[in-house]
Amino acid sequence: MLRAVRGGRAVWAPRGGSGSGSGGAKLGRPLRTAAPQRSDIFRELGPRLSRLGQALRGQLPESEGAWNSLRPHQNSPPPPERADVVVVGGGVLGWSVAYWLKTLENRRHGMRVVVVERDPTYSQASTVLSVGGIRQQFSLPENIRLSLQSATFLRTINEHLWVPNEPPIDIQFQPSGYLFLASEHGAATLEAGVKVQREEGAKVALLSPSQLKAKFPWINTENVAVASYGLENEGWFDPWSLLNAFRRKAMSLGVYSCVGEVTSFVADTADNTPGMPRGVGRVKYVNVRLPDSPEQQPVSCAIVVAAAGAWTGKLLDSATAGLQGSLTLRRLPIEPRKRYVYVWHCPGGPGLETPFLIDTSGAYFRREGIAGNYLGSMSPPEGREPDVGNLEVDHDFFQEEVWPRLAHRVPAFRSLKQVKSAWAGYYDYNAFDQNGVLGPHPQLPNVFVLGGFSGHGLQQSPAAGRVAAELLLHGSCAAVDVGRLAPGRLWGSEPLLEAAIV
């Protein structure tokens, strides 16, 4: 959903019920959807995943094999007893920071970096269940800079992540741009955002309704006051390919990959360390539970990077639960939020020139391939967040909320008859202000938090990983000032609001 949390009201995308406004008008006939099944995407997109597996073979070090690395490791080696840095979370942010630590260190047999991932199938990982968008159309300079630098990285990805004697990396980037639509109510906010984007170097055009209609004749411009269209570095790509490219390269540089779950921290606190101030601690060990085993392996370390995606908040809650009474950790407000994605077929739809469109209502869609398929969804209304205890898909949500809005904006979508497939994934949602959290924890200074990006972590992962590595290695980052994204803002500061959260 595109919104800024100000007084509970949307700024760019006014929210209404499914019957409020023309964007929520009910259509006259029901839409058939497939029977709700937890595994829709894996059942219906099985052939695609099979092709993906073949494409990934050889993309990882031969000691593991690409596709096998995405399955449970039957004989995964335990983690080493000592590490300089333990990265908790093997998603794209975790592997990005691991890669950058070894790259910027620039010496062989240097620091020992271990990435711990509890689910090597990535069955619930935000990375691989993402729709893969990248844009610079944000309202905050930090987000614009991170996405611009990430776009540059992706354009030159083989200069960074290619492994000698391996095939070139192809993330299947589709440079079709993002198209944000604003109503009269949201026009000023969108125009102010474009001004900041241009100041930061992003190429974004403002379109009047007549210009919008001339460029995209299939759009119904009713209630659209202005639109912004990304001219460069925007579109979408394959998240699997980026994740595996980071992982493959990092492992070739000597990063250890470990399957397991970090269950607890052992830390110096005022209770067990003379001179340690109360309320502050320093992690000495992490305990890693090995797969299918009650055993836990302690790993001594100097730094912990908490990059567990939607479970980063839960990680710190559970891992610090056993610390002594002098250290009561403030809760990190990063939590999972379930989001649905639907795929439909519409041969008479917008076609190959389709951008990633964000409607005034908050509904979105983009083209999926070249055979008349599209995917899209929207965030649920406030107060109607779905249960995060499973990844079941609510098919009624598409018929009652998503489809009416998109069919109003794109009349060709009125003719679609059935959703082909659907899946659910998790946002690593920062409930405080929906922006990334990047920096050392105030109470555990050697625990570096990297998460809470609320839907834009994948696209910013190349730059965010580099910034995190530079802060850890050098204490500063010249390229992007991320001081305002530090964890300290989460307690007692004003929210750092981003107007363009989808």
Residue ranges and their predicted role:
Residues 141, 145-148, 180-189, 229-251, ...:
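Short beta-strand to alpha-helix junction loop
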Residues 102-127:
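Glycine-rich FAD pyrophosphate-binding loop
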Residues 209-211, 258-284:
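A conserved short coil-to-beta-strand element within the FAD-binding core of flavoproteins
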Residues 404-502:
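C-terminal catalytic lobe of FAD-dependent flavoproteins
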Residues 289-354, 395:
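Central helical "cap/lid" subdomain
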Residues 2-85, 100-111:
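Extreme N-terminal leader/targeting segments of oxidoreductases
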Residues 331-333, 346-446:
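Active-site lid/adjacent beta-loop-alpha segment flanking the redox-cofactor pocket in flavoenzymes
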Residues 131-215, 362-364:
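Dinucleotide-binding Rossmann-like beta1-alpha1 core, especially the glycine-rich loop
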